[in-house]
Amino acid sequence: ENLGATCIDMAWAMLSSKDIPTADKAAAFEQQALKEVGLLDTQIPPRYATSYFNHVWGGGYAAGYYSYLWTEVLADNIATCFAKRGALDPRTGQDFRDKVLSRGNTKDLMQTFTDFTGLKSPDTSALLKARGM
């Protein structure tokens, strides 16, 4: 359900202003967006619809729901690092403190992520594994 909501969110965010459907066509737009990514199940309606997300889609917060899922990707990658290095290993904790926590917003956030994980970019398989896929 979260992946479906994320895909709907991204589909809306990618529209130009001239392509935004009228309110009476929003449900059809959602179904098409889900169909395009293989998440449309006509037997089970989506739990979340566009109208449910006014708090994240209103006020210039485009693709806001997507950011929730992206945060999970980053968190799952960091959790994987802790699992590989030893969550209780003092060096791992100090490394996280030095390379992530102490930086705050003083360094590019993706560089901070890379500095700690050693990954050039986040690995989405960590999210899939965390979700049992």
Predicted regions and their residues:
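C-terminal, non-catalytic "cap/extension" segments appended to globular domains
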Residues: 1-133
